Regions:
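Domain-level signal for soluble alpha/beta catalytic cores
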Residues: 32-433
Length: 433
């Protein structure tokens, strides 16, 4: 395609990194990595538990204001935004590297939320004042909890960390024409900035997230396509351009799909059988969009909406895990450390991973500002490793930490705990480290 970006060279061997977060104790600090390297072949978990995270990382208030101004159509300084993005992405890549993370990204520093993502990347829609939830589609990803705990939500107890779904909806986005991808320039800039930031940094993986058709559908109401299936495939046709461009640029594609679990809350009247049909349809559309992309270039991230709330009515992982594993991915990142879902490691006592696939359980959470103890992180990783195999586990986070914890330093401290916990788990599982 005309907007393809030249692939980046990533090392075939990976570096076993010693955590250096102490050198990067200020968010956004320009840290030049200086590490001792121990070359190992990148096979399975490379003789230890590798580490990654789910996407969003802290950014400065100045950059946040510029990014939101662009997304909301407000005046902003384009040159200042470009300069801030280049600087902060450069710094956040090095900060991840210094922490000892093996699989890094751009921190999603240039993105805002799912609704604005649709507005910036697609055409064929229009925004109109919200109808207050009338019509077929519920608007709350906490819908079942809302029915049981209306007083809690009425009191404002439903923070989203400034991410998608926070606050009252001022407008609703309607699909009124064939959906087309229009994010070529924004994506080209995003890829180029990340590529430049990686120069001189040796990592196991460099990944970029993109949203699934099902997740995008959350924030669009269909007034154009003749059926639900046609609508989903319309989104898939548009978004496959972004998916392919990310992979063609040399990056791992992370598909963010909170839709698979959190759609259950959006449709409170569905039975599990009905919801499984709902989820199957969206996986079919996603796999259609991913067709032609090598499976080993794809990882899937699923979570239960990441809002701060009761989550009592989340669908159990066991009810949908087989559908999750139908997504054509080489690794599966699953929220797994919060108080509602941590017990679900037992699902893997009798559920097998797809052949050759990796599991990335969230062992660090965003639902609390408590810093997880590295020994707790290690315990969580060892549990999974004993069930699916130590070579098939990678340490991850429940969701993006950037907008969901109380301060940037908390997010980075959590990632320090992640890396140290993985080191402790590796020592137990391999008898070294």
């Amino acid at each position: 395609m005309g907007n393809a970006v030249e692939p980046i060279p990533l090392t075939v061997n990976i570096a076993v990194l010693k955590p250096l977060c102490a050198r990067a104790n200020k968010p956004g600090a320009n840290v030049e990595p200086q590490v001792q390297l121990e070359e190992t072949q990148m096979t399975g978990s490379a003789g230890r538990i590798l580490t990654t995270h789910a996407g969003s990382l802290p950014r400065s208030e100045a950059l946040r204001d510029l990014v939101f101004a662009r997304a909301e159509g407000k005046p902003y300084d384009k040159q200042q935004l470009a300069a801030e993005l280049r600087t902060e992405v450069h710094d956040v890549v090095r900060r991840q590297f210094a922490c000892g993370l093996d699989s890094v990204n751009d921190g999603e520093l240039g993105k805002t939320n799912f609704t604005n993502y649709v507005r910036e990347r697609l055409t064929g829609f229009e925004a109109r004042p919200s109808e207050g939830g009338t019509g077929r589609r519920p608007l709350s990803i906490a819908g079942r909890d809302l029915k049981k705990f209306p007083e809690y939500f009425a009191a404002g107890g439903h923070g989203f960390g400034g991410f998608a779904g926070s606050g009252p909806s001022r407008s609703q986005v309607y699909c009124v024409a064939p959906l087309k991808y229009a994010g070529h320039d924004a994506l080209k800039e995003e890829l180029a900035i990340f590529k430049a930031a990686l120069a001189g940094v040796s990592v196991a993986e460099a990944f970029l997230p993109a949203n699934t058709p099902g997740t995008i559908e959350h924030w669009l109401r269909n007034e154009h396509y003749p059926s639900e299936e046609a609508f989903l495939h319309g989104i898939a046709d548009a978004m496959r351009e972004e998916y392919r461009a990310i992979v063609e640029a040399g990056f791992l594609l992370q598909i963010d799909d909170p839709d698979l679990p959190d759609g259950w809350q959006m449709y409170p009247d569905m039975s599990v059988v009905e919801y499984r049909r709902y989820a199957e349809l969206r996986v079919e559309a996603l796999n259609y969009a991913l067709s032609g992309i090598p499976r080993e270039k794809i990882r899937l991230h699923v979570c239960w909406g990441s809002f701060h709330g009761p989550h009592e009515n989340d669908i159990p992982l066991r009810d949908i895990v087989d559908i999750v594993f139908k997504v054509r991915a080489a690794s599966y990142s699953i929220e797994a450390s919060n108080p509602r879902h941590e017990h679900e490691w037992r699902v893997f006592e009798d559920v097998r991973l797809p052949e050759g696939a990796m599991l990335i359980p969230g062992v660090i959470g965003h639902c609390t500002d408590f810093i997880e103890h590295p020994e707790l992180v290690a315990e969580r990783l060892v549990r999974y490793a004993k069930l699916v195999g130590r070579e098939r586990v990678m340490a991850g986070t429940d969701c993006g930490l950037g907008p969901r914890v109380g301060h940037a330093k908390i997010a980075w401290a959590k990632l320090e705990a992640l890396v140290e916990g993985a080191r402790l788990a590796s020592r137990e599982l391999w008898g070294r480290g």
